[in-house]
Amino acid sequence: MPIQILPARLANQIAAGEVVERPASVVKELVENSIDAGATRIDIDIEKGGSKLIRIRDNGSGIPKDELTLALSRHATSKITSLDDLEAIVSLGFRGEALASISSVSRLTLTSRTVAQEEAWSAYAEGREMNVKLKPAAHPIGTTIDVVDLFFNTPARRKFLRADKTEFTHIDELLKRIALSRLDVTINLRHNGKMVRQYRAAQTKPQIEKRLAAVCGANFLQHALEVELEHGELKFHGWISSPEGARAQGDIQYCYVNGRMMKDKLINHAIRQGYESSLPANQYAAYILFIEINPHDVDVNVHPAKHEVRFHQARLVHDFIYQAIFGALQQGASLPDVVGHIQSEAEEQQLESKESYFPPMKEYVRQPQQTHYPKSEQLRAAVESTPSYPNKAPLDSWIPKGNVGSSSSNSTAPSRSFHTDKPTKKALSNYNELLTTQNREQRESTSQVNEQSHTFRSTQQIERVAPQVTQVSKNGITLGKVLSVVESTFALLQQGKQLQLLNLRYAEFVKIYGQLSSVNVEPLKPQPLLIPLSVGIDESICNNLSNYASLLKSLGIDLKVKNRTNIIVMAVCQPIRQQNLQQLIPNLLRYLEQINPSLEQVIKWLSHQIQHDEVSYTTAQAIQLVMELEQLWGDELNNFYPKLLKDIDITQVIQAFSHE
């Protein structure tokens, strides 16, 4: 068979395989065209599930007479003229394939009139070459498209259509999605001459709620939590169901990117992660969510049906969505009564002996059973591992190396270790930058201060030298060489001929305490959160927030009042940046309200609160932790013995070998 150019109708029929899957696909393309034309009212008439008739009528801007012929041609559109336009696309359609593809598999008539025209014109294509014929018609300003006998000339496609009721159900669901995306557009749907849906345009809040209830049901509205988050040009808003409003199936899950319906895997995964600790595996969240992003930062030309997009900063978008969902659920949940627990902790700290550095380890690291907040191992791992802001989404399975959709079972799988096998040069460099609280001149002057023994670190200035990649402490004293890790929580050290065992979990605590105690030298540097965090607090605490402004500022914590029961966390210091700020900040404010503590008491209280997962340390992690301790404390680490470090006596083992 020789190579030849396909006839126009055959080429369009082949292309229609991607664009026109079923009657609902036709409705989608035509209704989106009406919205792009600025229509505020769209009427849809369906007969026999769309196989007999699909009629879309709108009051949009219409199509001029001299453009009607082009409208039915392939790759003809008024929405883009260059690649730059595609990269900044804001319209729902842009390929110019819909009308040509639909007309090739049906009997299509396009009737339209613009404001500038005195009469309307109808266009239809016929014949092998799809020649377009025009004739005058009576029609108001706007456009009407009649699609008759869908797939009449492609029997193979027609036989795959389902029953009329099934096909109409798909159309009904599609229009629900569109009705939610454009609340300002009136949409009427008829089937076989009977009015089935009437979605009136909504402007006020009661009207919007009424439309939401009409689409999703009153039960969704009853359990809906409004969510809104903004960061630069990235905006996120909508409604999500509380855990009490969860459903047995995922039938109310609507997501939009710049007004475009989406079924994107990355977005779905972020939403699932946000609900992971709130819903059991057999329940589904209900949500209506809108993402607004700079068109230059998203590629919509990925999927033929435009159901998927590609974000230029996928990780940022994923975590942004996760943060918004998780934060809204935390605010919507009723907070447990923790006042009594905090009061008892405060009394214990006030009675603590001044000569004692620390109470037993179990009093400093809170055990899981002491808190009443719901937890998730993956969420805690996520909080620990994020370098950007609290509540960052888990990293273990979202990146689409293969099929991201497979991550739906992620909540039942064991959590992957979130530590790297070894500290990278970049990690060490970042750590160096984060912990440096003095400039070079200050460090040079500080290094000249005579060394002296300190009886209590928090009451005297402590020399701070930025950590270096080499394992040398600020006083030239090291803990020794890390040989191995024992039982995942202890490091075996060699100091000369002496072997020692280091408690790695207690070492983490000592590191955090040292970082917080540097506030006695100068205020901790606030680090702005990538996305400001909204936190719910008691109204009385919010009213007295100004009383703690100076203390919070010295700790590098920047809070702003949002309303009477909510504050915005703008920045926190590095030591607490990786904690669950949704819980830590309200607890801190309650503690300040209870006893009006001193700065030193707050430092010790914060050291109590900071939690760590039951981590299985690797040798590389142990080496890095030892290095950090040496830079923070130097020879002052002696003050934390023997809870931190114990000598190992191998004399008996040597003697046992000698007697064999």
Curated annotation (Swiss-Prot):
InterPro entries named among the record's database cross-references: DNA_mismatch_repair_CS, DNA_mismatch_repair_MutL, DNA_mismatch_S5_2-like, HATPase_C_sf, MutL/Mlh/PMS, MutL/Mlh/Pms-like, MutL_C, MutL_C_dimsub
UniProt-listed SUPFAM superfamilies: ATPase domain of HSP90 chaperone/DNA topoisomerase II/histidine kinase (SSF55874), DNA mismatch repair protein MutL (SSF118116), Ribosomal protein S5 domain 2-like (SSF54211)
Highest taxon of source: Bacteria
GO cellular-component term (any): mismatch repair complex
Positions of disulphide bridges: none
Matching Pfam families: DNA_mis_repair (PF01119), HATPase_c_3 (PF13589), MutL_C (PF08676)
Biased composition (Low complexity): 406-417
Keywords (A to Z) from UniProt: DNA damage, DNA repair
Family the UniProt entry places it in: Belongs to the DNA mismatch repair MutL/HexB family.
NCBIfam families documented for this protein: mutl, PRK00095.1-1
Described function: This protein is involved in the repair of mismatches in DNA. It is required for dam-dependent methyl-directed DNA mismatch repair. May act as a 'molecular matchmaker', a protein that promotes the formation of a stable complex between two or more DNA-binding proteins in an ATP-dependent manner without itself being part of a final effector complex.
Protein name, entry field: DNA mismatch repair protein MutL
Organism the protein comes from: Aliivibrio fischeri (strain ATCC 700601 / ES114) (Vibrio fischeri)
Organism lineage string: Bacteria, Pseudomonadati, Pseudomonadota, Gammaproteobacteria, Vibrionales
